């Protein structure tokens, strides 16, 4: 008997193969072994894959479930007849009602490529047989639900149009009923209620909110001059020193009295300091007045003639002479 030569897997192929092998269910294999042996009456052997590899037991299985599905079963030990048996089994279970996505490929079983998919196919076949009424002592597979078609008359169909299902939600909670489109004018009353319009424009309905909280009433556009009194109330301010609460406060530090950069600053406040009666002379020839101006000698002489002598008097005699003879410096 010839065999296919296939080397070991490496890299991604080995990783995929190991991942598939990790999903293999050994308990399901034991249940499938017992079920197949009970249905066919044939022994699979200790190795599940080698026992089903030739396809003979599989063809006998589908013939028990659906007699006459496989006309000829090849019992040769060659590879091609064994692959033909597996192919005939796959065609037979498709005709039996198996879904294409539940069926394995021939190489998955023959080359031990994906025994997990082989196991899945046999479990689905057991469930399909149970659905069709083929029962055994081995409980394996899931019975498929049968289609139940119901027909309703026109009266029941129309009555169901007014019923809101649970999947549609509920209409007992808050909704957007009565909301207008963006930018549309909103009325202060409900026209559908056929009620009269409000007496004035100050009537605010509950849908419009409340006017008891903070609002932007009286706020001006940026850069617009703000008055310190209400023009709508025709009230005149008492004086220009009245500052409303919206204008801030004048009880803290400010830049009032600050001069332009580079100008001289006065050392007194004319509102609180009285003018001095006598000038203050710093250099003897010039002085500084109360307002920071300089006082010349002529001004001082005109104001105080008795105290001004014009020039300094020399009280020391000039009849002596200095002599440095005989003195070495």
Swiss-Prot record:
Residues with N6-methyllysine modification: 158
Residue ranges annotated for the Calponin-homology (CH) domain, each copy included: 26-130
Pfam families: Calponin, CH
UniProt biased composition (Basic and acidic residues): 306-318
Coiled coil: none
N6-acetyllysine: residues carrying this PTM: 23
PANTHER family tied to this protein: CALPONIN (PTHR47385), MUSCLE-SPECIFIC PROTEIN 20 (PTHR47385:SF24)
Record protein name field: Calponin-3
Organism (species): Homo sapiens
């Amino acid at each position: 008997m010839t065999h296919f030569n296939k080397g070991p897997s490496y890299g991604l192929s080995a990783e995929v193969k190991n991942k598939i092998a990790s999903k293999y269910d050994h308990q399901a294999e034991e249940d499938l072994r017992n079920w197949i042996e009970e249905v066919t009456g044939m022994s699979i052997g200790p190795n599940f894959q080698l026992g089903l590899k030739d396809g003979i037991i599989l063809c006998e299985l589908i013939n028990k479930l659906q007699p006459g599905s496989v006309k000829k079963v090849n019992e040769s030990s060659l590879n091609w007849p064994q692959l033909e048996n597996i192919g005939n089994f796959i065609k037979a279970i498709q005709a039996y009602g198996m879904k294409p996505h539940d069926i394995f490929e021939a190489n998955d079983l023959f080359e031990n490529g994906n025994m997990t998919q082989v196991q899945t196919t046999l479990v689905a076949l057991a469930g399909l047989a149970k659905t069709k009424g083929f029962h055994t002592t081995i409980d394996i597979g899931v019975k498929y639900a049968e289609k139940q078609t119901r027909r309703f008359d026109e009266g029941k169909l129309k009555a169901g149009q007014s019923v809101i299902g649970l999947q549609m939600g509920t209409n007992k909670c808050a909704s957007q009923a009565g909301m207008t489109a963006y930018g549309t004018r909103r009325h202060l009353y409900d026209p559908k209620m056929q009620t009269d319009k409000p007496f004035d424009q100050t009537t605010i309905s509950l849908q419009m909110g409340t006017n008891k909280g903070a609002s932007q009433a009286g706020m001006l556009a940026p850069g617009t001059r703000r008055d310190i009194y209400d023009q709508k109330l025709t009230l005149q301010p008492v004086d220009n020193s009245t500052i409303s609460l919206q204008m801030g406060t004048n009880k803290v530090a400010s830049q009032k009295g600050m001069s332009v950069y580079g100008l001289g600053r006065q050392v007194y406040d004319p509102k609180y300091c009285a003018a001095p009666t006598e000038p203050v002379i710093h250099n003897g020839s010039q002085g500084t007045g109360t307002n920071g101006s300089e006082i010349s000698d002529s001004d001082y002489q005109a104001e105080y003639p008795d105290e001004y002598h014009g020039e300094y008097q020399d009280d020391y005699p000039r009849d002596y002479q200095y002599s440095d003879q005989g003195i070495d410096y």
